[in-house]
């Protein structure tokens, strides 16, 4: 603990607020909150911490704090700071899992769509659904029952759905605003649990149609009722009042927490969400922060009611979330909370050993790698690889590993702009220059280690840009491959020397994974780019074939060869004029055409 931290600890106030832990670069690596800042922050430096917390404390070189007037303000501030800084040790909600919802848009001609994005717009959202199939099946059922618009851009001409009786937006006299509101209200009622009343009304209509000898209409209604039964009865009933609820249960051990969330919609348990993560504050404060972020900063629609176990500050959560947050003390609701807690315990016990082993293995790998290179532990590693075929469509790719694990959000692809021909060294210079010029311009975090796929030439090219042009002093290593294109050795220094990594060591496995991953990412990007240029180049040369017609042809015929075999009549069926179809076929079947 340095002198600066000692001084700050001595003057910490005993008030609610948030604290920001920083590393040697001034980067915020952890954000926390507390009712009493002095007690909480001091506990990191003066308590007996587990290995995980010790690792965090070892990286802390400074901290800041912000005092708030209440615990509610501290919770809201904590969530906003975590969203702003995305600290490495605040990992509780980084899986980006999102669920499908049904949405009625707020357009003049509203649509019913499946979406995973919750926007603050005037649309109405219903869900979440356990998977996209369940959401689409429900949408399909509602499409049969209610004639909302199906097409994206109604042109005024009747569409296929209009002729099927499933869309009125293209009719000569489309529904009025009032009629649309009535349809939207019926769909909303259906999705909020009113499908039983709708089923009952349909049964009455079927009876009347049958009595009037209108058997065709009676059969249509019967089919609709069967679709309702098939779609809505797939899920197990759990509560009789059909209120939308989320139920939280949690368990913790050895500095790790598991949270189980049960999604109850229309009285039915439709899905559960499991999160396992390390935590550094008290369990009670951690679960409150988790639930707050779950709704305010993640892709989750707030239900009418949230149920939580005993010991959670439900009043604080209710004020922050502005919904009902209850602690049930008896009955079926209490049983469901206990079930969520039990599932959290089981999940934690099942996953704990695997998570702990994986954590130890990856941390050990980067620590060993740092020791072998005689540098500080490389928490952030950026790796580069180039790809081209005889200089055509040259590309480069960069991947990021943080604490021994890939962070795919940080991956980047580069089309090479200035290099002509197969020059791997100039390609490396260009991509390193572009990457770290931007890092400096936008004040982005610098890596602890850069790895390039290649030997002395690639390393020299990268160092030339980093040190001579940009004035950066970042450790750089190279990865050489054997004749079977497998990771052979790690090179470091200039001139490069072989780093003696044991082939069975975690450090060697790590650099091998990095080399394989950056190669995969680069070659995939190159194939996509090359495939796109080969696939579309010939169509681009034909007068009268713009982007829409090109997409239409490729979507229908799948390949250039299949387009060659088509007839003018085949293309006319797609709405392509005869003269354009003739131009396409003449061009593609000319002797100078290259096969693709």
From Swiss-Prot:
Superkingdom per UniProt: Bacteria
Domain UVR, residue spans: 196-231
One Gene Ontology term, aspect cellular component: cytoplasm
Compartments reported by the entry: Cytoplasm
Keyword DNA repair: yes
Keyword DNA damage applies: yes
GO MF annotation terms: DNA binding; excinuclease ABC activity
One Gene Ontology term from the biological process aspect of the record: nucleotide-excision repair
SUPFAM superfamilies named in the record: C-terminal UvrC-binding domain of UvrB, GIY-YIG endonuclease, RuvA domain 2-like
Keyword annotations: Cytoplasm, DNA damage, DNA excision, DNA repair, Excision nuclease, SOS response
Functional description taken from the UniProt entry: The UvrABC repair system catalyzes the recognition and processing of DNA lesions. UvrC both incises the 5' and 3' sides of the lesion. The N-terminal half is responsible for the 3' incision and the C-terminal half is responsible for the 5' incision.
Subunit structure and binding partners: Interacts with UvrB in an incision complex.
Family statement drawn from the similarity comment of this UniProt entry: Belongs to the UvrC family.
NCBIfam families: PRK00558.1-5, uvrC
HAMAP family: UvrC
Protein name: UvrABC system protein C
């Amino acid at each position: 603990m340095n002198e600066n931290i000692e001084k700050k600890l001595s003057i910490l106030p005993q008030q609610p607020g948030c604290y920001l832990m920083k590393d040697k670069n001034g980067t915020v690596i952890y954000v926390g909150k507390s009712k009493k800042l002095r007690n909480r922050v001091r506990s990191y430096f003066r308590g007996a911490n587990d290995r995980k917390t010790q690792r965090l404390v070892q990286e802390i070189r400074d901290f800041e704090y912000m005092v708030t007037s209440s615990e509610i303000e501290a919770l809201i501030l904590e969530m906003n700071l975590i969203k702003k800084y995305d600290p490495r040790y605040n990992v509780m909600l980084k899986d980006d899992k999102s669920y499908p919802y049904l949405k009625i848009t707020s357009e003049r001609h509203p649509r019913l769509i499946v979406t995973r994005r919750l926007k603050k717009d005037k649309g109405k959202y219903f869900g979440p659904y356990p998977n996209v199939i369940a959401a689409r099946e429900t949408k399909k059922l509602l499409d049969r029952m209610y004639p909302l618009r199906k097409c994206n851009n109604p042109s005024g001409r009747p569409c296929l759905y209009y002729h099927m009786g499933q869309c009125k937006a293209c009719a000569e006299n489309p529904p009025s605003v009032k009629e649309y509101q009535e349809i939207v209200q019926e769909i909303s009622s259906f999705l909020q649990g009113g499908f039983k009343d709708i089923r009952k009304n349909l049964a009455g209509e079927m009876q009347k149609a049958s009595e009037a000898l209108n058997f065709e209409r009676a059969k249509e209604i019967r089919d609709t009722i069967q679709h309702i039964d098939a779609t809505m009865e797939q899920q197990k009933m759990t509560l009789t009042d059909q209120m939308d609820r989320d139920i939280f249960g949690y368990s913790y051990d050895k500095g790790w927490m598991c949270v189980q969330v049960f999604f109850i919609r229309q009285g039915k348990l439709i899905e559960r969400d499991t999160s396992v993560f390390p935590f550094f504050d008290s369990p009670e404060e951690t679960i409150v922060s988790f639930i707050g972020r779950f709704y305010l900063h993640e892709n989750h629609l707030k239900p009418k009611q949230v149920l939580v176990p005993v010991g959670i500050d439900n009043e604080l959560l209710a004020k922050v979330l502005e919904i009902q947050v209850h602690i049930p003390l008896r009955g079926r609701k209490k049983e469901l909370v206990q079930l969520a807690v039990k599932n959290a315990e089981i999940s934690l016990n099942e996953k704990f050993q695997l998570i702990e082993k994986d954590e130890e293995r990856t941390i050990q790998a980067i620590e060993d790698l740092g020791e072998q290179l005689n540098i500080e532990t490389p928490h952030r590693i950026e790796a580069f690889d180039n790809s081209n075929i005889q200089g055509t469509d040259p590309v480069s790719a960069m991947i990021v590993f943080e604490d021994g694990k890939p962070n795919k959000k940080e991956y980047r692809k580069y089309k090479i702009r200035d290099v002509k021909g197969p020059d791997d060294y100039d390609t490396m210079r260009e991509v390193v220059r572009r990457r770290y010029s931007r890092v400096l311009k936008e004040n982005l975090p610098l890596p602890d280690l850069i790895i390039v796929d290649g030997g002395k030439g690639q390393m020299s090219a990268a160092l030339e840009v980093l040190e001579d042009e940009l004035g950066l002093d970042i450790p750089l290593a190279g990865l050489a491959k054997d004749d079977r294109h497998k990771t052979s050795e790690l090179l470091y220094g200039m001139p490069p020397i072989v780093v003696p990594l044991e082939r069975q060591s975690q450090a060697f496995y790590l650099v091998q994974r990095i080399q394989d991953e950056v190669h995969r990412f680069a070659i995939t990007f190159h194939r996509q780019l090359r495939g796109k240029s080969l696939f579309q180049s010939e169509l681009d040369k034909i007068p009268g074939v713009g982007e829409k017609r090109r997409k239409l042809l490729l979507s229908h015929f799948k390949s250039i060869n299949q387009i060659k075999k088509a007839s003018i009549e085949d293309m006319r069926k797609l709405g392509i004029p005869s003269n354009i179809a003739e131009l396409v076929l003449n061009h593609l079947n000319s002797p100078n055409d290259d096969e693709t």
